Amino acid sequence: MKKIIALTALFFIGFFFAQEPIKALSKEDIPPEVSKIVDISSLTFIVDTQPSFPGGMAAFRKEFSQNFDTSALEKPKTGILKTVIYYAVEVDGSILQIKAVGESDSFNKEAERALKSIKTKYYPAKVNNLAVRYLLRMPLNMNFK
């Protein structure tokens, strides 16, 4: 039992510190497989205020990691699983149109499922103090040793 707890703690420590900051996207940054899911024509790319999660990114990562089920993954013996999750933050702050792009289908599906299960709404992006749809990108890496 102690080994399971230690491995789980090691996973989450690696998960939290392996992330890159979320950056603003342009239409050119969006992969074709994401363009098929997300209605790009209704997105705003230049905003006055970025969308933000209540409690900040630490609260978002905590909620995401609590929803992430590592037992659903096809785990390699060693190496790194990588995916990039794209998701639209709607004008009401809800998360919709989620697509994970990476090499491992099981990792992509679990990342999408974990994000869909987050019920807390974002504070939406704003232009001229009006809420707008905005696309976020979150890289996700998981190390196996």
Give each language-model segment a name.
Residues 13-14:
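N-terminal signal peptide c-region/cleavage motif recognized by signal peptidases
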Residues 5-6, 17-145:
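Charge-biased low-complexity segments
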